[in-house]
From Swiss-Prot:
Record organism: Kluyveromyces lactis (strain ATCC 8585 / CBS 2359 / DSM 70799 / NBRC 1267 / NRRL Y-1140 / WM37)
Protein name per the record: mRNA-capping enzyme subunit beta
Main location: nucleus
Disulphide bridges, residue numbers: none
InterPro entries in UniProt: Cet1/Ctl1, CYTH-like_dom_sf, mRNA_triPase_Cet1, mRNA_triPase_Cet1_sf
Catalysed conversion reaction: a 5'-end triphospho-ribonucleoside in mRNA + H2O = a 5'-end diphospho-ribonucleoside in mRNA + phosphate + H(+)
Subcellular location(s) per record: Nucleus
Comp. bias intervals (Acidic residues): 85-96
GO cellular component, as recorded: mRNA capping enzyme complex
Ranges of compositional bias, category Basic and acidic residues: 103-131, 139-212
Taxonomy of the source species: Eukaryota, Fungi, Dikarya, Ascomycota, Saccharomycotina
Amino acid sequence: MKPSRGLSLTDLVNHDDAPPLNNGDNNVKQEEVQAENLATNPASVLAPGPVIVDTLPPVEAPVSTSDTGNTSHTGAAPQTAVTAESDETDTDDEPGEIVFENTKFRFDDEEQQPQKDKLVKGTSSEKKDKQVNAATKEIQLDSKPVKEQSPKTKDEGDIPVEDADKADNKVETQKKENGIKQEVEPVEQDGKKSVEPAKQSKEDSKKEKDIFQQKTSNASVKNNIKKDLKILSELSSSSLPKRYNVPPIWARKWKPTVKALQAIDSSNLKLDDSILGFIPEDDLTKSVQDWIYATLIAVEPELRQFIEVEMKYGLIIDPSTSNRVNPPVSSQCVFTDLDSTMKPDVDERVFDEFNRYIKNLSELNENMGKFNIIDSHASDLSYRVRTHTERPKFLRMTRDVNTGRIAQFIEKRKISQILLYSPKDSYDTKISISLELPVPENDPPEKYKNHTPTGHRLKKRTSYIHNDSCTRFDITRVENKPIRVNNKNEKEPESDTTYEVELEINTPALLNAFDNIQHDSKEYAAIVRTFLNNGTIVRRKLSSLSYDIYKGSNKL
């Protein structure tokens, strides 16, 4: 038996002209329709799930009436397996369904025949490709056959193609809106009927996809486990976690963003004295500079050349206790108690050691020619001369012991003094400014030959003159001899020996800087500062020698 094709739209339009089928041949036609559906719908064989194809019940031949008489005629459409339903079959309870999935509608009757020829003449490979494409398309869309009723025909003529197309679309939209469930029909595969829901194919496809996804997910899980094991091995290999070795930014100590100090080249370091380019004077030095300046400016200009600025070492004595003062200070300062006095004197062993130290210092190679050393042995006689019209004068006559000549005859006037207390050192300091005025020629020394002196001092002195610092170091051993009064029966008192260390500033250099202070104050400040620096060196050296001798305990 020749296989029949599927019902086309042309057959539906011309269903009135189709001849009726014989009742005896209904079963045969039914099998031909199923075979034709399998031939035209290969997706039912290739698809993993069942393809639903509705079988059409036997249809009686339509009866057409005309005005001349009730005559009926039957005729089979060429190459059709099922005839179109009449108007009477539209109201049946179980109408047959028409398959449109694999049927291409042609609106031109002339083009349909060549298309049939192409389908018949197509190669087996093309048919196979089309079958595979149709099967995959059906799987993806998960399409189900929809029951569709053939459009009603009119008695006068055929239904236009456009109206039939609109009717089909309207039926489909209504079914989608109303949620009509499509029936599942059995399909013959290899001579066996298998009825499975259309959802099974979708679940099978999802299972296949889930298998591939599960494989990829298993691989990613294994990779993540390997990464975690690697991180754990790295953490176990180190003694501490990384966050302790490299603390986070919020746990680090603050560091200034300016890195100017890091840019300093320590190999060739040149520091400025300060941001202004000079060293500011400390308070003590500034106080002494101001004090000297105020004293000099108070002296008459013609007498300034006889000024003597001396620094001596001793202990500041409290008159109430006859002991060294002990103010509540911890560093060197200016002591302003006017009742306190200081007697210039140092310990004999300290004096000898310091004299040896200065001598060795002057004999160093780098100091050769910088020191001028002068030894002298003189006798000083002091006189207090009092007149009715003038204030008392203190005269001092200096005579060379070795030659007996008068070396100096002067009037000494004390102008001012300042006491510097040094709690960390063994000795304090006194800076005094005095005038050593020469006695006029009309008042010769012989005039005071019969006068009784107020003091007699034998001085054995060694002077170290350092011109580069404008300082003279006098290391003097003084023997104070008592003065005998007219009572000859009294015993001569014992002499008192003191050891004095003095520093004297170069007066011409000081006065020169003082005169130019308005134009250049740096020279004056430098001379006074250098004088104080030398005094600090001497004071600290005396303290260190005293510590070495007495093991840190001061001899008071």
